Amino acid sequence: DFVNGRIGEQYGARMLGKIGVDNTYSIGVTQAVMDTYHPAAISDLAPIAGELRFGAEQDFYTDAGSMKYGPFVAFYGLQFQEAIQVDIMLKYTAIKSGSYDVMVVYATDGLNKDANLTILEDDKSFFPEYNGVLTVRDGLFEDFADRAPELEQTLELLTGQFTNEVMSELTYRVDVL
């Protein structure tokens, strides 16, 4: 309600229901890590982090902000063997080539599938939710009442219809195929 009110005040728009996607930051691990250690959640990395190399784009290592490398490793009690900065455009190439074992990703990125990454559960909820919603301008449904009287109800049908897995597959088809 708060966010919807702010969007209305600032942009003259409103949100419809959540479509079911949470494109938050996530932690992806390689198949080799899965085969050797079988982690299911980020907490599972704590006892093995010293054997793993962590990679992320430069922005993840900056001091400003709470969702950065320092607060992340402190929150989960992780001490990686090495923390590697990589250009955001090269991070998937780098993990596929074996430059590191663990990487910060977006949950719905199709390149996660291409790199054969497993997304670990954020079992302590470090990363905030980034829920996907449809946003429409004020007056949209009134403007289309004659031509599309069911527009609002039709768009509301999308509420809860997507998952991160579905969205990841769709972005994979766009980014890779």
What are these regions (language model features)?
Residues A32-D35, D59-D63, T108-L111, G139-E142, ...:
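Solvent-exposed loop/turn segments at secondary-structure junctions
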Residues G20-Y92, N164-E165:
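Bilobed "Venus flytrap"/periplasmic-binding protein-like clamshell domains
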Residues D1-F2, V29-Q31, I88, V102-L111, ...:
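Beta->alpha turn/N-cap motifs
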Residues D1, A49-L52, A94-V105:
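Alpha-to-beta junction loops
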Residues T24-D35, N131-R147:
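A bilobed periplasmic-binding-protein/Venus flytrap-type ligand-binding module shared by bacterial periplasmic
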Residues F2-L16, S99, L111-S125:
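Ligand-binding "clamshell"
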Residues R6-R14, R147, L157-L177:
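Periplasmic-binding protein-like
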Residues G17-S26, D122-G132:
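Short Pro/Gly-enriched coil loops immediately N-terminal to beta-strands
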